[in-house]
Amino acid sequence: MKPQIKDQVALVTGANSGMGLATVRALLEAGYRVAATDLQTAQVAHKMAAYGDRLACFIMDVSDRAQIDAACTAIEAQFGRIDVCVNNAGFLSYANCEETTPELWHKTMRINLDGVFFVTQRVVGGMKTRGFGRIVNIASFGAKTGGMSPLPAYAASKGGVISLTFSFAREYAAFGVTCNALAPAFVKTQMVTEQVSAERQVELLKLIPVGRFCELEEFAHCVLFLAHPLSGFITGEVLDLNGGLQFD
């Protein structure tokens, strides 16, 4: 694979921390110009400042269609176009079936599912016109298994992301636009290392055949692989990133 990309623009949602921030770094290192979007972007702007004007940060709430349109319009004004869209923004609702309120259910769907649809809807027209595009959706191990804990709203929303991935892939393949998804499990984010107890981490590690959590850099480079121009014959794929925890 050719290492350096020239003159391509990538949009990353949920870019201010964790998997999104790691993805921004990997794309910048590969040569992309990157539009990083999130509810607030101070951290990504600070940590990626060395990349200068190849990075631009925009406030965008993926559950708000007006903000999606405004941010994408600003990105296109600054960079000219959007070639790659990484739908990473997400919300994890810690509630079982009986604990899930209508408000929590709808919030989860607005961010995790509606956000993927409406961001993609906004950017895919330009990709189609130019005859090239890469859409990478972040689903979840839980979408395929129900998850290790009872999180029905989250699992259902991410299952919807996988279905959207299949639908987009079929609709836009003839126009040079691919759409694929990642289904990660136990990526070593701050949430995992700080909010999951040491005892629970030990229990989880026993379930993962490779015996460790996924590094952020490993996650980001899987995104980079699916976003690359040389990955044009891969579409409608869900790439499992789970250390052998589950096989199709």
Each PLM stretch: what is its role?
Residues M1-Q4, T145, L224, T235-D248:
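Short C-terminal tail/terminal secondary-structure segment
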Residues A173, T178, I234-T235:
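Short, small/polar-rich loop/turn modules that mediate ligand/substrate recognition or access, typified
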Residues S140:
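Residue(s) in the substrate-gating loop at a strand-loop-helix junction
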Residues G125, F166, R170-E171, G232:
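Alpha-helical segment proximal to the catalytic Tyr-Lys
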Residues N96-C97, L104-H106, V192, L204:
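Substrate-binding pocket helix/loop in short-chain dehydrogenase/reductase
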Residues N16-S17:
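Conserved glycine-rich cofactor-binding loop
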Residues T120, S157, T165:
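Active-site helix of classical SDR
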